[in-house]
Amino acid sequence: DALEAGDNVLVAAPTGAGKTVVADFAIYLAQERNVKAFYTTPIKALSNQKYHDLVETYGPARVGLLTGDTSINSEADIVVMTTEVLRNMLYEHSMTLDALRYVILDEVHYLADRFRGPVWEEVIIHLPQSVRIIGLSATVSNVVDFSKWIEAVRCDTTLVVSEKRPVPLEQHVRVQADDHTEPELIDLYRRDKDGNQTDKLNAQLVSRLDQLDRKAAKRRGEQRPDRRKGGKGGKWNDHSRRPERHTPRRWAVIDELNFLGILPGIYFIFSRNGCDQAV
């Protein structure tokens, strides 16, 4: 209703909660009204994925893609691009913007990024007033203030917030003494009597990790003092002297996830070099 009434819309909802339905409706309205819709993402990989998704729905003739090094059907009715590309188009006063009426800003929480945030800010400020903005995010900490700011620099903005997770987020810790012992997958948080996850750390996990630390210390000929006796100056306050916990091999983790039937999954490695070595 808000989009049909001409409002901007900001959607803050967990992953899988249906944020893209709002974006899809904006694209539908653009097609019905014979105007253009842009779909922006923060990275090329997301742009490429969204481009292929939209091509499946609307066909290659109606969908374009613009990233730093790719240009496909740039004058299409629906164009997917990185946010930086849209910012550059605004500063260049591109003719492509003439029929633009809807802009979907996916991952709009990037506005808070200290390095790239100004790009989102410039886009929101400099887009023509005839354009309606649809902001999508799963993580906006100050979503009410953000919505008010958009309304202040543009026009009426409808805020849609949902905190319910259609797919519950469950967190576990993989614990293993060494490559010769069976791994354990222990809940990070306690569960209540109904089996629901709470926000309190799982005492079983803390106890198991403490047990592994003591065993590791014993193997190194060190004796860990009882924490209940206190004391702040002991060698165990030196983090560099604490026994290192076992780091499982990647293939072993994947094998276990496969055995538990919870693949596919994403294995995060926080460096490009590490990713190259893992392959």
Model-predicted regions and their roles:
Residues 125, 132-134, 139-279:
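Conserved interdomain linker/interface between the two RecA-like ATPase lobes of SF2 helicase motors
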